[in-house]
Amino acid sequence: MATPAFFDYETYMTNKLAQVQNADPAAGWTMTKLMDSFAQNGFVGADGAYAHFVQFGAAEEIAPNADFNANEYYAAKAAQFYGVEPKAVTEFQIANVKQIITSNGMNAWTHYQQFGSAEGVNPSNAFDADAYLAAKAVAMGDGWTAEKVAEAIKGNGMTVLEHYLQYAGTGENEVAKGATYPVPDDQKVPSSVTSTTYDLTVGQDSLSGTIGNDTFNAFIFDNQNTLQSGDRIDGGAGHDVLNADLGTSALFAATPEIKNVEVIKFRAQANAADNGS
């Protein structure tokens, strides 16, 4: 599988490492361990990492380069969708837009490729599409405008970011090598999201996560399960984790309702004698 210009192997692996370290801090993830895990599953080198991105990474919101950020893209799309200033977009608006996108079978990267770039939505605070299009029009000269450049890029089946990463510095009609186009400070969207840890109780719990990477802990308390029938957990957006210990404190199987939680870890324990049946 050929590796496209938008895919930066080192950046992707660094971002993936951060994701697994956040999801499982006790696992002792290192870059060497991650690369070994990739290789054991058939994802070797840059081509293998790109294959992993296509199969898993995009859906996990792991950025393939330094100029894309899933959280910032969702925020930029929300600002455009609701018609508000980028700095004024709220977490509720961001979460709602992300829900719309994911419920239609897309993620930040695939939505940007299919729709966002053509709509003029920035892929992150690190890349101002309008600034790049204006600079590219100047480099082209001879009556070119930013609008004409945008149409030409779209007509060639590319996003603005892909065009920049593939062609910057490659010819006299291109922008200079190493030129960057960060979003102005007063037009940046919020770059961080709230992540929360929730502890379940021995009562009935109904918990909804944030758009961040939330953790739900359901540990045994006073010899009782805290994850039990009647509990409802909705992780919401982000890469969420449920840690649950289950003991034999009830006569019936626990049947909680769980959705939008990406990682679920169960530990089961029992202290009952075998009755021979």
Where are these regions (language model features)?
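Solvent-exposed, low-complexity segments and loops of surface/extracellular structural proteins
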Residues: M1, G141, A146, T180-S277
